Regions:
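Phosphate/dinucleotide-binding and metal-coordinating scaffold of catalytic cores
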Residues: 1-259, 263-264, 277-381
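Conserved protein-kinase catalytic-loop segment immediately C-terminal to the catalytic Asp
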Residues: 270, 275-277
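Extracellular C-type lectin-like domains
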Residues: 264-265, 270
Length: 381
């Protein structure tokens, strides 16, 4: 078994053993529990090993990633955890990493924010055919989650995440652009997106919103920070957890998010694709992260005849209409709602993969949602 110290920048957190398959097998020593990732620490070594593995699995390429089987064959590894282990668990979403026991490495020497990184793994996901590449283990692409193909790229000194769509319609990149433009019209804090065409396929680009001084904390690690009371709703419990962690501005952020998700029929707002930003040095929460990862929306997985129907929703209720009922204040620009259908139409119309009927049906469905949203919000104030 290999031995590693999980680090937060240059602060040692815990010494562990890891299997050849890339998973944590045992906790050997705890150093600085106060600097652990949110929601992970317990002084029970066995439970801590389980929690660390849960955390570790959240930062490796998921089994659902398009093209993963080919990548594992190409790199001759049994699991994506091995790829992340080879890159020392480094990420562009936070400052945690694996330091081999006995190593003199520092965070300054290995982090991907200020050092170059390999593009080989990310590019391999997008190549139709490839001979086995020379394996450079240092890449943040080994620590990116989500099922769509993606890669980190640097353009003019700025680090971007590039993400593809799913065949045959490749709609998700266009959805990201449309959702960002809708959020802009509603004055909702969001990550900006732009579209590029690479090898005749659309990709959406968004700049990294995390820096060397911050970390992204997914809502997934916040929601269980307290035990849930039988009297608490899922939404109420989540707010209570955020209050316990002293995260500012949560209620308003969630209400804005629910308005956007209702408008664009976001069917994939799981606890991993929204969350909060924490100061990596003081470990104090700074507030909500800008909204991102809105691509699985606008009925992108529905037939033309199904566009406009209500799809299963998450995370607080099972439909967008029920989630909208959680909104108690109008915290968006209500005058911007009227423009949203046209914003969506103009964006999706640029795709050569979406027929005119589909674009029309989607924009009309957004128009119906816009009228419903405006009517609901106008009654609140």
């Amino acid at each position: 078994m290999d031995k590693y110290i999980i680090m937060n920048k240059n602060i040692p957190l815990v010494k562990t053993t890891m299997s050849a398959a890339g998973y944590i097998t045992e906790v050997l020593q705890i150093y600085n529990p106060e600097a652990f990732p949110v929601g992970i620490f317990t002084d029970d070594f066995n439970k801590l090993a389980d929690k660390l593995n849960q955390w570790w699995r959240s930062r490796i390429i998921p089994a659902s990633r398009d093209g993963l089987r080919y990548i594992l064959h190409l790199y001759d590894v049994e699991s994506p955890a091995v790829l992340s282990k080879r890159s020392l668990g480094l990420s562009l979403s936070d400052q945690y990493w694996l330091k081999p026991v006995g190593s003199e490495l520092t965070w300054q020497e290995v982090n991907f924010f200020t050092n170059d990184f390999s593009k080989e793994l990310g590019e391999a996901f997008f190549q139709k055919e490839s001979s086995r590449p020379a394996i450079n283990p240092f890449t943040p692409d080994a620590s990116s989650n989500g099922w769509l193909k993606k890669k980190w790229v640097k353009i003019n000194g700025v680090t971007y995440l590039a993400k593809a769509g799913s065949v045959p319609l490749l709609q998700q990149p266009y959805n990201e652009i449309a959702a960002a433009n809708v959020a802009e019209a509603l004055t909702i804090k969001h990550v900006p997106y732009e579209l590029i065409i690479e090898d005749n396929r659309p990709l959406c680009l968004c700049p990294n919103f995390i820096t060397t001084e911050t970390e992204f904390v997914p809502a997934y690690f916040v929601k269980d920070i307290l035990p849930k009371s039988n009297n608490d709703s899922v939404y109420g419990h989540f707010l209570r957890c955020c209050d316990y962690l002293q995260i500012p501005d949560v209620a308003g952020y969630l209400q804005q998010m629910l308005c956007l998700d209702y408008l664009i029929e976001n069917s994939d707002r799981h606890y991993g694709n929204f969350g909060f930003i924490r100061d990596a040095n003081s470990l104090k929460f700074l507030g909500p992260a800008p909204l991102f990862d809105n691509g699985t929306s606008l009925w992108c997985e529905s037939l033309n005849s199904e566009i406009g129907t209500e799809l299963p929703a998450m995370p607080f209720k099972d439909t967008q209409k029920k989630q909208l009922a959680l909104v108690k204040e109008c915290l968006i620009d209500i005058n911007g709602i009227d423009a949203c259908a046209e914003i969506v139409r103009n964006t999706l119309s640029t795709s050569p993969y979406l027929d005119k009927e589909r674009v029309t049906r989607i924009s009309e469905a957004v128009g119906n949602r816009a009228r419903g949203l405006k009517n609901y919000l106008s009654k609140l104030n």
